[in-house]
Amino acid sequence: MPQQLSPINIETKKAISNARLKPLDIHYNESKPTTIQNTGKLVRINFKGGYISGGFLPNEYVLSSLHIYWGKEDDYGSNHLIDVYKYSGEINLVHWNKKKYSSYEEAKKHDDGLIIISIFLQVLDHKNVYFQKIVNQLDSIRSANTSAPFDSVFYLDNLLPSKLDYFTYLGTTINHSADAVWIIFPTPINIHSDQLSKFRTLLSLSNHEGKPHHITENYRNPYKLNDDTEVYYSGEIIRAATTSPARENYFMRWLSDLRETCFSYYQKYIEGNKTFAIIAIVFVFILTAILFFMSRRYSREKQN
């Protein structure tokens, strides 16, 4: 059978729940972005340090780079779909098997050489302060085939979703140059429309007329599943077939992100405007209480 091409649409009702898929050990605390690139097709950030292990992985996979995809509109832009639902954008984190292979180029020749983590982007009505650190770098790479040092303190852990259950399948890299095992987090992270629109101002490679144009979209449409392709899920499939797991409880995720924003304001103003800092931390406590009671309510609903 031919290799399964990526991306794909994940049908949650057909995913195989596998209790042996343990939580991933994600070690991004030592990862540092070195450069950011406009390849003419996408935004790429190169990293030094950081790795993943645990779960079903045989050993450590070292973080290599981050790729970002988007669409013309905020309603679509992700490569992968969950129950035919397309998100606003998608982040791909590319890792390679350093323990088994001597280089990334060598690793990509083997079906156990690459692991790609997928994080969905969902546009809501407030900014993501952590994603903004990437947005702030885009002016330095507006032209195609340009790169620049990533000159801001950036912690990749802050871009991980609130829930780390995952789907996984064996596919290919997005450009189909190599096999890759995909790990897809169905819970998205939220960003603002203005943040995503900034990516559409980047310039691509020259067109047939010799003129560069804006990269208004760069996502790929999904490929049909091969008959022998199996998608596994690290949790229990308890949702209705028509319900996407990533679309559940948007309000709770919005409150969670709002709480993080309030806490960042508290840290920013605690040494200056103490009144503003106190107001921010009060909101943090209030939002924490609301999230606690809402999570208990949703848990009871699922049990029923």
Predicted regions located by residue number:
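Alpha-carbonic anhydrase
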Residues: 1-304
